A protein has these predicted regions:
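Mitochondrial intermembrane space
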Residues: 5, 20-112
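Classic N-terminal secretory signal peptides
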Residues: 1-23
Length: 112
């Protein structure tokens, strides 16, 4: 094997290893982000029973976005609220309750 080829192969292997670790970290970071948005949105939805959150996988540049679906206490009809998570302040705000006549949303069976 030529002497010049060994450093090139070592550099290629190191680059591939770094890229795979970066991709895994990035995936882990996005999963942690989605978990944080879900937890914060569900905690803020105190007026809803049996609430679940459907999180936009990446949100926007500044905000995480989710739909929170649940039944208002004392009601039998499910509603949806839009939840906005500020990525910098780590705070959430909920929109008003959207009824099924306004928007139709079906939460996936695996929603939290």
């Amino acid at each position: 094997m030529p002497q010049r080829l060994i450093p090139a192969l070592a550099l290629s292997a190191a680059a591939a290893l770094f890229a795979s670790n970066a991709a895994a970290s990035s995936g882990d970071a996005w999963e942690a982000f989605r978990t944080e948005v879900s937890k914060k949105c569900l905690s803020a939805a105190t007026s809803l029973e049996k609430a679940s959150a459907v999180v936009d996988p990446f949100g926007s540049k500044s905000f995480g976005l989710a739909l929170v679906i649940g039944t208002p206490k004392g009601s039998k009809t499910a509603v949806t609220q839009i939840c906005v998570y500020d990525k910098h302040k780590k705070t959430v705000e909920l929109g008003g309750e959207l009824t099924p006549e306004t928007v139709t949303i079906k939460a996936p069976a695996k929603a939290r």
